[in-house]
Design a protein with these regions (language model features):
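GIY-YIG nuclease catalytic motif and its immediate N-terminal context
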Residues: 1-39, 43-55, 60-67, 80, ...
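A common structural junction motif
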Residues: 72-73
Length: 96
């Protein structure tokens, strides 16, 4: 799964604080978040659990999708997560 554009949502816990990001290497980026190697929001608020991701063919499409999701209200984001991950299980294990 290296070098494939992706949009992802991290959560601090079930129905907790959310963070939306975009990357070209999902495994590497989530590992960085989990190990607090990314300074800022996710480190400060303990947002480390991968609860949603979608892969894209082109980075531009992933960036546009990230921008779109960041504009959504919280409930729409929760609905998106729960559509594919109703129990908010940690998806990290699926990747590695």
């Amino acid at each position: 799964m290296e070098k494939q554009p992706a949009v992802y949502i991290l959560a601090s816990k079930y129905n907790g604080t959310l963070y939306i990001g975009v990357t070209s290497n999902l495994i590497q980026r989530i590992w960085q978040h989990k190990n607090d190697l990314v300074e800022g929001f996710t480190e400060k608020y303990g947002v480390h659990f991968l609860v949603y991701y979608e892969l894209h063919e082109q980075m531009l499409a992933a960036i546009e999708r990230e921008k779109q999701l960041k504009k959504w209200n919280r409930q729409w984001k929760i609905d998106l997560i729960e559509k594919v991950n109703p129990t908010w299980k940690e998806l990290w294990e699926e990747l590695v």
